[in-house]
Amino acid sequence: EVFKPEKGFQVEVGARYEITRTLQANVSLFYINKDNIRQTLANKGDIANGVELDKKVVGQVGRMDSKGFDIDITWSPIYNLSMSAGYGYTDAKVRDLANNPYMQTNASEGKQYAYIPKNTFYAFGAYTVSKGMLKGLGVNLSTSFQDKVYRNSDNTSSFDAYWLTDLGLSYTLKSNVRLGVNVNNLFNKEYCNQALGNQL
């Protein structure tokens, strides 16, 4: 069976404010509505070529809406130093679920939509040495947070929230060639944000 096309609309408004010459802020509000959304309904066992498979049943279940806001602040207190931070809030809910044999609609309606975190945060800083023996050397450090995400429609299974930290070093040569190295997940944090499997 071919899925119906997913339909929806989105509204977003935002503003940028220059508090001082070195400090700026951005704020945005959004609302998203989607119809004919697809959702993993259940896992179902199957056998193919004598091999047992655990497949996901995917179907169109109804409507979801998402609303929230994002705030970003950028600060450059001195030359060649830039810092920024941001926070995002998203309230994404499942609405108007269609009846199906794989899940209870009354247990899923109004629940947080799968794989969308409610809270996110990031902070970033970068500095480049402008004079002396280390002129051209740059360093940047960032950290980010993602709230827990649910793996299913009725919010009975989830991935934990986590923090990640990244570090970067760079050096700019006289010929404007930049060399750099980045270390992602600096503290070797174990985390999960998605689960993949066979679909049916």
Where are the language model's segments positioned?
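Short, basic/aromatic-rich helical patch in the C-terminal catalytic core of site-specific tyrosine
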Residues: V13, I71, L167-L169
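Conserved C-terminal beta-signal and adjacent last beta-strands/turns
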Residues: K111-L200
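Glycine-rich loops and low-complexity Gly/Arg-rich segments
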Residues: Q39-T40, G50-D54, M83, L97-A98, ...
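Short, low-complexity, polar/charged sequence segments that are solvent-exposed and flexible
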Residues: K44-N49, M103-T105, S158-Y162, N198-L200
